[in-house]
Amino acid sequence: MEINEEAMAAHKRAFLDFLDQDVGKGVYMQAVRDMVQNKRHRLIIGMDDLRNHNLDLARRVIRTPGEYMQPASDAVSEVARNLDPKFLKEGERVMVGFSGPFGFHRVTPRDLMSSFIGTMVCVEGIVTKCSLVRPKVVKSVHFCPVTGDFLSREYRDITSFVGLPTGSVYPTRDDNGNLLVTEYGMCEYKDHQTLSMQEVPENSAPGQLPRTVDVIVEDDLVDCCKPGDRVSIVGVYKALPGKSKGSVSGVFRTVLIANNVSLLNKEANAPVYTREDLKRMKEISRRNDTFDLLGNSLAPSIYGHLWIKKAVVLLMLGGVEKNLKNGTHLRGDINMMMVGDPSVAKSQLLRAVMNIAPLAISTTGRGSSGVGLTAAVTSDQETGERRLEAGAMVLADRGVVCIDEFDKMNDQDRVAIHEVMEQQTVTIAKAGIHASLNARCSVIAAANPIYGTYDRSLTPTKNIGLPDSLLSRFDLLFIVLDQMDPEIDRQISEHVARMHRYCTDDGGARSLDKEGYAEEDDGDANAAIFVKYDRMLHGQDRRRGKKSKQDRLTVKFLKKYIHYAKNLIQPRLTDEASDHIATSYAELRDGSANAKSGGGTLPITARTLETIIRLSTAHAKMKLRHEVLKSDVEAALQVLNFAIYHKELTEMEEREQREMEMKQQADHDAGATGGTVDGHGSSGNDPMDVDVGSNDQNVSAERIEAFEALLGQHVLANHIDQMSIDDIEQMVNRESTAPYTRSQVEFILERMQDANRVMIRDGVVRII
């Protein structure tokens, strides 16, 4: 709209007064000096400073920005010319942008309604499309060969705030009818680009299409963001006429004309930590059963699958990403796949990840294409220009992508995610566009076997039906089987029945996956951490004494714990952990070479070595440690061993592992504090060093447990089912600090035979 010169001059004086007497003691005058010195042409004004100086002016800038954008630009340009007369050319202006709090005018693309048209808004979202940067003519210069005169003409479109829009036709003749020649070298242009901004996936309404708004950026704001970036854009929301350039239909196209673009980090919706939260997190990390606690807290409505839940926890925590000086990128994100029979809660586990992970995007194999997962080059319907559109994996940068029905995806589409899973980038080279986008995300996929149900007579590779090049990119591959066991079936049926019978106090059904259930308050100090025990909901599976009612964390606290450990803890490998990883990897390689063909779900390759490092680092994050210890490597090997060979550790091995973790945690805490922590002080006596006595058969329970642990670990690592007594004696004495006599070895083996754990015949011990 046209503004009279008197009002323009008054608005300009108001901004000059703001620049001369700004509250920040000359902050903006210094900003103008820096702008002139660095040859920039945009000044950002904070709304808080403008409100403190003139509240009425700040309100009018937001409500009617069309009246104040040009006076603000003229005021800043005048100050810049006073500092340096040569800074601006004739007719050139300094552009002005705004930042800071906008109150009710801080919205998402879904909240942009007709009431915001003509006002200044701050919109937050994620960039999904970017057009090519095109020049737009601002001033054309024409030469008349007959008269020898030059003729210039300025152009303004509907997006301009200065004056009324002009026509876009080039003049071909002057007023006397003489032909004109356009001097393209003397014309003035400015860059412009169109963006498409969509509401962030985690905040979009379920069951509704995400809303999108077109953004027009010009001059220095072009190419300031790329598809997948989360941005906060301040601009004027305007209505533009359609292609017919008329308003007969009464339908207009709305755009956001930006004056300031700010990049947001990936954790824009990060939780807020209190001092009490940090204290409780450290208490949880010092527990011996932290891994089991987090695993049980994830999707408590799903019965069993504890090892898979533990793996999902490690996946959400992730390892440590490394970018070496030579340009090598080592990914820290963990990829995981579940293959198994129908009705084993694979999809429900994916939904649990969607509920817990800070950023997660869900797709399906049949409903997703290769370009939909990575990136696509599309054409603008109005201009016909090529645009780069981000896919699900680019939008989930620094998050998790959940792909259900992975086996239903076409082979051509499945190949498209190979680069993402290993290099964590999406490279596009088509239609004249060559670009590389970041897709640093974890992938968790669920698939059914190729025959519908898992055929135990075939190898895992033949059951899965996916190429090895894709399977090797998954760090963990779990075979989830529908076990036909009457006892397990009874427990599952009781668990499902309790889920359906669970009601609130008023008799209504209550959601089991929402935070309302998780934050149920029982008046206790730990109410915000642990879920209140309910016999109908949790059943009778309570163990371990007094702490039995506090073995599940609330959803809210679990989100905080995972977010804190993932982003603020960056562990590094110790020498002891590195040596143990190398030794364990060599044993896995040797075991896979000696095992039968197809004995494991995944081949043991160099990627498996990186998998052990990532899992160990994730476990150290879970324990809130800044160093990866040997116990972290052991926990990672347990998860990896279950994924590859589908074998769980025995109770004896679990007890040995817990003792190792407790000892290393106590040593680590004592080294950090210089004293004892939680009553676990350093002692000169090892718990395994006991007095055997004069009688060889007087073996303590600790020595028996240590013997059984050594034997179990050796059998598990080498995948053997029988050994001679001589070999067992040599092995345990080689690994143990206190040697065992022959009679002690035979005595312990006889005890194990009485417990039906081994069978001894002709000097050969067969493991049952």
UniProtKB/Swiss-Prot annotation:
Q: Which reaction does this chain catalyze?
A: ATP + H2O = ADP + phosphate + H(+)
- Cite the InterPro entries for this sequence: AAA+_ATPase, MCM, Mcm3, MCM_CS, MCM_dom, MCM_lid, MCM_N, MCM_OB
Pfam families linked: MCM, MCM_lid, MCM_N, MCM_OB, WH_MCM3_C
CC terms in the record's Gene Ontology section: MCM complex; nucleus
Give the Basic and acidic residues compositional bias ranges.
661-670
Location in the cell reads:
Nucleus
Report the residue ranges where the short sequence motif Arginine finger is annotated in this entry.
Answer: 472-475
Please give the positions of the paired cysteines in each disulfide bond: none
At the top level of its lineage, which domain of life is listed?
Answer: Eukaryota
Question: What GO terms in the biological process aspect are recorded for it?
Answer: DNA strand elongation involved in DNA replication; double-strand break repair via break-induced replication; mitotic DNA replication initiation
Enzyme nomenclature, EC number? 3.6.4.12
List of residues binding ATP: 340-347
What GO annotations for molecular function exist for this entry? Answer: ATP binding; ATP hydrolysis activity; helicase activity; single-stranded DNA binding
Q: Region (Disordered): which ranges?
A: 661-689
**Cross-referenced Gene3D superfamilies:** 2.20.28.10, mini-chromosome maintenance (MCM) complex, chain A, domain 1, Nucleic acid-binding proteins, P-loop containing nucleotide triphosphate hydrolases
The record's similarity note reads: Belongs to the MCM family.
This chain's function reads: Acts as a factor that allows the DNA to undergo a single round of replication per cell cycle. Required for DNA replication and cell proliferation. May act as a component of the MCM complex which is the putative replicative helicase of the replication licensing system in eukaryotic cells.
Protein name, per record: DNA replication licensing factor MCM3 homolog 2
Higher taxonomy: Eukaryota, Viridiplantae, Streptophyta, Embryophyta, Tracheophyta
The coding gene here is ROA2
